[in-house]
Each structure stands twice: as structure tokens, then as C-alpha cells.
Amino acid sequence: VGPGYYDFDIWKEATDILAPYIDEDMTVYGEICGWAGEKAIQKGYDYGCKQGEFFVMPYRITTKKKDGSDTKYEWNVDEVRQWTENLVKEHPELAEKVHPITIFYHGTLADLYPNVKVSEHWHENVLQEMMNDKEHFGMEELEPMCKNKSYREGIVLRIDDDPFAEAFKLKCKNF
């Protein structure tokens, strides 16, 4: 991969940060936040970084299953967060370059919103509840990580132990 849109290869820079700590048969997926040289990676979003700085936020990890098969084990989000926190704890020099993901809520949406009836357009109604839930998700609020005034992008939903390893993004309207 070459530099492409940016003046340098931001993906190689991010890979170089994490590569020494990634085990064989382990794949780490991450979001690169901040700046790629003089350009914001996501226009209008500094994520607390000064121009020219960035950090990597691992959000997904897969490893080879212990049974020796070629099937990958998909880590749950708590495991990804814990791996990242341990990495930074063991290597404090990475604290500004690697950040753990924020988990806004861990549990079922039926438990979070017991008043939303499963039998009455549950999918639509629970998404509406989430969009209006400032306590848990802060949708349509300013992104607290940013120094500049930018609205949150949204949230990602994942199901623990999902055999399909799906992720769903609920984007903020202001994004």
C-alpha cells in the first residue's frame, strides 16, 4: 500500500506501532484517528491529536483457533479492550499511540430498553431509543475526544460470540 491520499503511508506507520506486539496467527484491526501529516484523517475530527499526530484504536482481533483448524477465533469486544489496555500497561511508551476502544454498553438491548416491546416494530423502536439515549450513547452530542467542535460519528454494535462476526454502525444524523 502506498501513500495514496495522504503524503505518507499512514497504514504502514500504524502497522509499525502494533506489529512488534502481535502474535503469530493474530490479526488486529484498528481505527487510525487524528492526523496523517498535515491532513486530518477524518475531516473536522482531530480526536485530541495535534497536527501530525495520530493514534491507533484496535477494535477487532482474530486468532487461529486452538484446535489447530484454519478457523479464526473472533475476540469479543471486552477481550479486544483488555488486550489493548494490557499492551499499554506493559509498554507505557505506547500510551499516546494506542488507545483502547470505548465500550458504551455491554449487554442486550432488550435488557437496556425493557419497555420497548419486541412484538411492536422492535428494530425501529430500539434504534430510536438508542439515538435518543444521551446517558449511554451520547448520540447527536459533540465528540468529547475532539478539541474542535465536531459531532460524534456514531456507534458500532457487535454481538458477542457471533458466528458471522458482524458489526453494525448507527451513525449520528449530525455526522
PLM-predicted stretches and their roles:
Residues 1-175:
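Core nucleotide-handling region used for phosphoryl-transfer chemistry
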